[in-house]
Amino acid sequence: MADFEELRNMVSSFRVSELQVLLGFAGRNKSGRKHDLLMRALHLLKSGCSPAVQIKIRELYRRRYPRTLEGLCDLSTIKSSVFSLDGSSSPVEPDLPVAGIHSLPSTSITPHSPSSPVGSVLLQDTKPTFEMQQPSPPIPPVHPDVQLKNLPFYDVLDVLIKPTSLVQSSIQRFQEKFFIFALTPQQVREICISRDFLPGGRRDYTVQVQLRLCLAETSCPQEDNYPNSLCIKVNGKLFPLPGYAPPPKNGIEQKRPGRPLNITSLVRLSSAVPNQISISWASEIGKNYSMSVYLVRQLTSAMLLQRLKMKGIRNPDHSRALIKEKLTADPDSEIATTSLRVSLMCPLGKMRLTIPCRAVTCTHLQCFDAALYLQMNEKKPTWICPVCDKKAAYESLILDGLFMEILNDCSDVDEIKFQEDGSWCPMRPKKEAMKVTSQPCTKVESSSVFSKPCSVTVASDASKKKIDVIDLTIESSSDEEEDPPAKRKCIFMSETQSSPTKGVLMYQPSSVRVPSVTSVDPAAIPPSLTDYSVPFHHTPVSSMSSDLPGLDFLSLIPVDPQYCPPMFLDSLTSPLTASSTSVTTTSPHESSTHVSSSSSRSETGVITSSGRNIPDIISLD
C-alpha cells in the first residue's frame, strides 16, 4: 500500500512530457490534455500495472528530481551485472531501465509477460545498444573544477551550490534540471538586515543570492555565459532574464549578455524551508554548461575606489622609465620621436583628471579618471580601457604617481609634453602665450555712472589739454564703489549765450536739465509793449499750449492801459518796480528768470530761459 501511494505521488508530479512517455511505454493513448493524460496514468496504476511500468515511473521521477550521486554509482553496478552474458534467468532488477533502456524508448520487452526470461531479451538488444552508445560523448563530471572570474563589485560570503554540470539526461533538444539548496539562520539574518525598501514596494538587498552560469571549461577562469533558450524558475516562479543584445552582424543569432543573476527576491528567507531552482535550456553539440549559486555582498564604486587607493600609488620612476623607452631613438628607423604630448583631460568625462589611473597591461601614458571609470562599470560592467579599447580589469588598475605630481604642480594646464630625459613641460595655448602690449590708459576716478543712458561731464580748462579715457565697462561691472558719485555742477549761461531775440521764448527739450541763472542788462528791456509793431491779442487761458512749462503765469498777462484799469496795473507792477535786479528761482527740476524794470506802469518783465532747463509742468498756483 505504501508503494502504491508513493507511485501515485510520483505520477501526480509528472509533466505532460513524462506522462506521454509513461503512457507510450505502457501502450496507452498519449494524446490529449494534461488532465486526461494524468487520469489515464492513475487508472493504469490502479488497474495493477506490471513491474516494468513501476520501474519506468521511478525512472521518470528520478530524471525529474535528481537526488545525489548514488544513482550514478548504482548505474555502474547495474551495467556490469546486466550486460554480463551469464544466461541466468534472474528477474529484472529495479534499476535496470535507468542503466540500459532509458535511451531506447522502443524496446522488445513485453509489459504483460513478467515471467519471460530476461536473458533472451538482453541477448537480442545487446548489439544495437552498444552500436548506439559508441558515438555518444563521455558524460561530464557532476562537479567540474570550473573557476569563475571574480566580480569586483561582489564579495563572496559563502558557496550555496558548487559549480555543477548541466548534463543532458535524454536525446531531446530541450533539457531540464533541478537543484535544491537551503539557507542557514545566519545567512537568513544577513540577508534580512541588508534589506532596503525602494519606492513602489520594491526591495533591494546588499547581501544577495547570486546564480551564475558559464561554460564547463577548466582551462581558464570563465566568464558568465548563458545557454540557448534559457529558462529559470525559482520556487516555481519564473525569473526574468536580461534582454538580448543586438547581434553584431546580420544572420547571427541573438544572445543574452552574460552577467550574474540576483535571485534574492524569489528565495524563501527561511532556514526551515529549502529552495528549488529549475533550469531548462536547449542542448548544443560540443558545449557543456555549469551553474553555481553564491551568497555575495554587493559593493559600490566608492568602496572600490577606496580599495584602489589602499593599494598605493605607483612610483613615478616607472612612468619615467616608460617615457625614456618610448623616446629612445631606434637606429633602424629613419623617423625618431623626440617628445610626447599627453593630455591631462579625462577621455571619459572630458574634465581635468583628479585621480589619474590606467591599467598595467596598457602601453600608453594617457591616464583616465579612476572615479569615473569605476562609476561607468558599476552601471554596465565592461572593463574596457577608454584610451586603447583593451581589457582593463579592476585587478590591473594602478594610480600613476608621475601624473599625481604633475596635477599638483600645475593647476591651469590641460596638456603637457614629455622630453627624452623623462622631464616634462606644460603646453600653454597660443592665445595665452601671445600677449598684446599697449599703452596704459588713465582712468578718471571722478567720473561716475548714472542711471541715464547718456551722461555729460564738463571738465575745466586745465583738464581739456589731457585726453582722458573713461572705462564704462569696469565702472559698471564693479559691485563696490570706493568714492561716492560726484555731484553734477550747475552750468550758468553767460550773456553771450542768452537768446538774441527779445521777448521770444526759446524752448528746446533736453534729457539733461541744468539750472541756470542769467543776468540781464536793464537796457535790453523794452520800455513798453507799445514799442512792438505787432498788435497784441488777448489769448485765453484755456487755449494756452502745454509746451510752455515752468513759466510764471503772471508774466504772461498783458499789461495794457486800454484793457486793464489803473488799480489792477498797480497791483501787478508793484512787485516789479520794487527793484531792477534779476530774481532767479531754481529747483532740481525747473529754472526760470524773471527780470523787471521800474521805468513805467506799461513796462513788463521779459522772460529769458535756456532751452535745456525748461520744465514740463506749468504751475497755476
From Swiss-Prot:
GO molecular function per UniProt: DNA binding; nuclear androgen receptor binding; RNA polymerase II-specific DNA-binding transcription factor binding; SUMO ligase activity; SUMO transferase activity; ubiquitin protein ligase binding; zinc ion binding
Gene Ontology CC: one annotated term: nucleus
Positions bearing Phosphoserine: S476, S477, S478, S499
Listed EC numbers: 2.3.2.27
Biological processes per GO annotation: DNA-templated transcription; negative regulation of androgen receptor signaling pathway; positive regulation of DNA-templated transcription; positive regulation of transcription by RNA polymerase II; protein sumoylation; regulation of androgen receptor signaling pathway; regulation of osteoblast differentiation; regulation of transcription by RNA polymerase II
Subcellular localization(s) per the UniProt record: Nucleus speckle; Nucleus, PML body; Nucleus
Composition bias, Low complexity: 577-610
Binding site for Zn(2+): C362, H364, C385, C388
Domain SAP, residue spans: 11-45
Ranges where the record places region Disordered: 577-621
Superkingdom: Eukaryota
Sequence ranges assigned to domain PINIT in this UniProt record: 134-299
Per UniProt, location of the Glycyl lysine isopeptide (Lys-Gly) (interchain with G-Cter in SUMO2) cross-link in this chain: K46, K249, K430, K435, K443, K452, K489, K502
Catalytic activity line of the entry: S-ubiquitinyl-[E2 ubiquitin-conjugating enzyme]-L-cysteine + [acceptor protein]-L-lysine = [E2 ubiquitin-conjugating enzyme]-L-cysteine + N(6)-ubiquitinyl-[acceptor protein]-L-lysine
Region: SUMO1-binding, residue numbers: 467-473
Known function: Functions as an E3-type small ubiquitin-like modifier (SUMO) ligase, stabilizing the interaction between UBE2I and the substrate, and as a SUMO-tethering factor. Plays a crucial role as a transcriptional coregulation in various cellular pathways, including the STAT pathway, the p53 pathway and the steroid hormone signaling pathway. The effects of this transcriptional coregulation, transactivation or silencing may vary depending upon the biological context and PIAS2 isoform studied. However, it seems to be mostly involved in gene silencing.
Family per record: Belongs to the PIAS family.
Domain free text: The LXXLL motif is a transcriptional coregulator signature.
Protein name per the record: E3 SUMO-protein ligase PIAS2
Protein's gene: Pias2
